[in-house]
Amino acid sequence: MKRIFEVDPWTVTSHDLNPEDKRLQESMTSLGNEYMGMRGMFEEVYSGDTHQGIYVGGVWFPDKTRVGWWKNGYPLYFGKAINALNYVKADIYVDGNQVDLAKNDVTDFEVSLDMKNGVLNRTFTVFGVTFKITRLVSAAVKELADIHYDLSSADGQAHKIRFDASIDADVVNEDSNYDEKFWQVLDAGNDTDSSFIATQTIENPFGVPQFT
């Protein structure tokens, strides 16, 4: 495996923001608590190559096999662990400029997975603002994930921050055999303090139960 992280007994740390290593970086900074897990993809928009993935244990879909007529002995479907809703998605602007580390002039970048405490930390500076982002999935409450943002001015100037957070059910699996989207939205809503979305896996012709 290509080494892009520093050697340390308990932390997986990198200061490298190389687009060619982005997927490896995401894989190596994944989080999980035996109930759900997620890759170390960025919360904010990233227009470069990335592989977003959030998964819930036991939730899968029978993806119809795609083979030619000459193939014999293949199953009718392959059980696929499908991407769950993206609940970490955020669109962030500094003084009207969209935060996108694939395009921005980024300094002081660091991503570090604390293996002892199960916490992912990321720091970077763009547009005169330093971002410190902490993410975890709870070991005590299996359905709980937490993301904390700490923003500070790096240039001594005042900045206007726009933060659009969302729960995204329009997710895909890159390796789906027929480019299907496996979730359908049943209900959604929000108020001043919270938002929710209820989804269910789409119907399938194989008698596999649908997950909600």
Where are these regions (language model features)?
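Beta-sandwich/jelly-roll carbohydrate-recognition scaffolds of carbohydrate-active enzymes
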Residues: 2-212
